[in-house]
């Protein structure tokens, strides 16, 4: 039972405050609806590791689970505002932490803010595209994947591998049609660049493979 587990992990965390022991103890407190202890634990973890973003998200999650949604929203908002001097790894960590608690809109906010801050140093296209795809915004997802090729053609293999997984290349597939339409427009707008021509040839080859199967 969680009553026994919380005693065990409390001792374990006291002797060894590792990430795993913290996570197990926090889960026990939340399962027992002991929100005061959970909050104290998470806030203590934030003090010990102020640059680790996901512990700050834990504090907001505890407010949410205890029924104080407005306090949780304020906490999340405060975390996003604190990103002004964040590193790429902190932005990625925070975006992932929000996605893990199904706060995808907040994760998008984090990645868009990160993109403004670091520019082409790290564009966050793959993270944004994945969320847009989960939300059913396939057009937005494809746009993100194709945009990243303007930053570096070195991403082409990653883009192709990902699109291969998420797009059905049969002729009837609307996603396939959106991809080809976007590629044609980009070829017209950027005739001097051959990256989109390469992508279109690749897309047609995938369709041929699908039809031959």
For each of these PLM feature ranges, what is it?
Residues 11-12, 44-45, 78-80, 113-114, ...:
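Canonical positions in the second alpha-helix
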Residues 16-17, 50, 84-85, 118-119, ...:
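Short coil turns that delineate tetratricopeptide repeat
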Residues 21-22, 55, 89-90, 124, ...:
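TPR alpha-solenoid repeat register
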Residues 25, 59, 93-94, 98, ...:
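Structural register within alpha-helical repeat arrays
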Residues 31-32, 65, 100, 134-135, ...:
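Register position in tetratricopeptide repeats
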Residues 47, 116, 133-157, 164-168:
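TPR/TPR-like (Sel1-like) alpha-helical repeat modules
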